[in-house]
Amino acid sequence: LPMWKTVEEVENFLRTVAGKCKTTLLLETREAVECLDEVLKHGDMDEIHIGLNDLHLSYGLDFMFELLSNGIVEKIVKKIKRTGIPYGFGGIARLGCGDLPAERIIMEHYRLGSSRVILSRSFCNNDLISDLSEVENVFRNNMRLLREYEDTVSKMPDSEFVSNQAEIEKIVEKIVKMKRRKR
């Protein structure tokens, strides 16, 4: 269910689906964050994805990853985590890419207990590749690199995640300042 804003919208959605298929709530609005406690009491959804792009716009922020640096995502996932409902957030670029490097975002996924993510277009941009077999090769290679990095991250000590969180705050602040100067 995308762009929901009220408990009633979620209730109607879950009642309509009635267990016929897997349900995912896309938490993408400020209003959804504000009524999340009530929505989570229902517990009938299969998973929740926090959509950073629409959510940052809903909050009037300049950069979607401000939601990581300002604590909003952490506040949301703490609530979801208590319910046991699987969750994830945002999207990631391929390793070595992104205004905020994908490696840093992946570390935040691990720190926050996320179990799912959407891959951004830059992960495998099929607009730049016309040969379907080449798209498949690029995707497969990027997935292999991602899984290898995940394995490395899964073995990191907590201190690495604390350092990463602080570095994300610095990088996001710098990006936001640049965006505001361009206005």
Q: What kind of feature is each model-predicted range?
A:
Residues 10-24, 67-90, 140-158:
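Alpha-helix-loop-beta-strand connector modules within alpha/beta enzyme cores
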Residues 60-69, 110, 123-180:
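C-terminal helical cap(s) of enzyme catalytic domains, especially alpha/beta-barrels
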